[in-house]
Amino acid sequence: MKSCAVVLVRNSSEYIPAFLAHHSRLVDRIFLIDHNSSCDLRPMKGDRVEAKRLDAEYFGQAEFINWSIDYFNLKCNYDLIFTIDIDEFLPFTGGDDIKEFFNNYTSSEIVELYWRNGCVEESGYLNENSEISFCRKRSSTRKLVYNSARTKRFQVMMGNHNAKHPLFDLGPVQLRPRPHDSGLGLLHIPFLGMEGLRLKVADFPKNDFADKIRHSVNLIGIEPSSDWLEGEISRRDYLRLVANYRTNQINRILDVDESDFERVKLFADLGTHIAEWRSRLNACPAAEVRSANPAETARLSQLKAGQFGYLRQLRKTLRTDPEGGVRLS
């Protein structure tokens, strides 16, 4: 059994060393897709890490993840595919845990992991001393895990919260498998203190990110008129914001307090590995950041998972160069 993780990252350097140290002990290979970061992450490539750089400003998570899965032929080369974000950490401690997880769901095509949101008190790089408070309650936001030994009919949607299942790339002709809830929580550290949230809001498109955060803020009862992002919020509101991060329905809001969080040192035994990855990250050169391009946006926004010929269009649209760059053809 072989497993891999695919991660699309824009900046978020504070997460990268801990993410790579944690997941390189779990899966056989990590596919790190650098999406127009201010430093070039291709030097992070190594024995268990593949790295590409997307030379595009357009925020197309699904398109770039699906292109990566297709380009690296992951559905044929790996039995278990985790498509996660740089702030998400699988709830396992070693490769044997991954094998046990796979064996538990050998007959399942799609498995669900639901966020267990957590927070750290300090900003800066995650490290072996980071004490993370994870909510014991799972949120209503799920991520999907693909058992490609059972199915190759999947195309990621919406940051991998959902998927399409076209038959032979035939668009509306779909065979939808029923996802199985693993009962496990995907450990999610959405921001590193309020300053980290401010940086995250600045890094991503307003309509794709900031507006969704603001909707969650309104649902948990923080006054819309309050300067919640720039100012200070109460400890209770902060914990409720963490637990309900990106929750968009009032009936799914978790009512939490300090007792609903447990403190975990997730990276306690990874100090040496985190330091090694941090050193490699510090050696990555600065990169030219692509600015918004209306023609690029118009072209890529036409590609939607599940449409007829979607993968063929992705192959025509995105091309690689010998240096590991990916750009529009």
Model-predicted regions and their roles:
Residues 2, 7-21, 36:
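Active-site beta-to-alpha loop of glycosyltransferases that engages the nucleotide-sugar donor
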Residues 4-6, 29-31, 50:
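A structural signal for isolated positions on well-ordered beta-strands in alpha/beta enzyme cores
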Residues 285-329:
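Boundary detector for helix-to-coil junctions that initiate low-complexity/charged tails
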Residues 21-29:
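Short, acidic, metal-binding catalytic loop of nucleotide-sugar glycosyltransferases
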Residues 62-66, 92-299:
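Catalytic-site signature of metal-activated, phosphate-bearing donor transferases
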Residues 34, 85:
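Conserved SAM-binding loop
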Residues 39-83, 91-92:
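Active-site-proximal specificity loops/subdomain of glycosyltransferases
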